[in-house]
């Protein structure tokens, strides 16, 4: 094979490899996979987050004395009138139904419903049960004769029993969240860290395990449908949070004064826990060396009329927990008994309601079951709102970065989240449901919905791909493609140049040969020197 043909075959192989192997391989390695997302549907949800929600809460009415066959219909009319008098941010209503044996049987199995019991009495009033979701409405015969009973029951339900919904779901409220400056953001899993701090290094012990078992475990069980607490305890020596510097400064110290003295960041970072949210209980004893006579600003705490004044003060730290400061230092080898810790646990349990957003300020939780039930519904709506915001952020992110990959897993998570959202809405909109089981299930599903949306948004493969834009791809492949392309280009140029030169040479040779042929023919015809002979 000649040198020219060999060069042609080599060039052809280069071109074939470049076109049939290099280009598909380059396209495969540089193409960013972008799974499709329901962008239009997510955008419609963002524009109107509660467009397909109408929260329905069933309420069952029963009477102990008189039988009112149509009282639930009359109450329903008054309830609708009250609810329609206020523009709602999230549509919601009460479905007033008669109490029957089916509901009674379901309640006996542990599935509690909202029940209104009408009781004949000498006065008109209402009261909410402490350990159930029952509302007692007291009426007299005059209220029956004047037909004022339905309105009074409706007013009690809307403005008192469902006061949280009435307040947070109207148009004037900024959002459905019950969080304030004190409460932490809602999380279904919360870690509780209980720490004993001693200003001295003397060994101490405390009966924290039986105290938590006897006094905090029932509280955990009560709140278990709402939050799941994990608890750890520890003892820290030689740390009184610098409280001795406040000794003698004033007779009354508030949390504002403490915030300028103590540093809780070190205490918060001592324990590792997998939960995203945490609450803290710090029980502090001063040092005997720096405060031998105790802390003068501790005036004592009075839990109730039955319990005498205790030698410690409790301070609620916004979005952190509770600090309990004892007046006197511990003696060496002291053992803090369960009886001493019991009032502290009682006070801490009371403050937890405020830290979770169930109460505001020093407000007492008079009907905890009703309040927690309302808090579940508001949390469900809050989770739906949060999930929609997360999905919309995902859509905006993918639209802003066109080079970002959208893995199939992200698309599957989004579709699953939207299906789960519809499942939650079916539970909220069904007037035939509304017991503890339904609200607990809806809350659990809404927590899973938030996790799914966050999983889709923080997908590792999608975020990692964002760090390799098109400019980086060119920078990576150009050192490889550049030399190969240059060799092929100049090789092709040289081949074409040689081909042109050879074509010119062949053309010149053909012209010379043609002239020689014409000359020979002219000689045969004796046409020499340009003269023709006949």
UniProtKB/Swiss-Prot annotation:
The keyword Hydrolase does not apply. Residues 30-472 are lumenal. Glycans are attached at residues 100, 170, 228, 247, 299. It comes from the Eukaryota. Pathway: Glycolipid biosynthesis; glycosylphosphatidylinositol-anchor biosynthesis. Residues 1-8, 494-534 are cytoplasmic. The keyword Transmembrane helix applies. Keywords: Endoplasmic reticulum, Glycoprotein, GPI-anchor biosynthesis, Membrane, Transmembrane, Transmembrane helix. GO terms for biological process: attachment of GPI anchor to protein; fungal-type cell wall organization; GPI anchor biosynthetic process. It is found in: Endoplasmic reticulum membrane. Belongs to the PIGS family. Component of the GPI transamidase complex. Involved in transfer of GPI to proteins. Forms a complex with CDC91, GPI16, GPI8 and GAA1. This is GPI transamidase component GPI17. The lineage of its organism: Eukaryota, Fungi, Dikarya, Ascomycota, Saccharomycotina. The gene is GPI17.
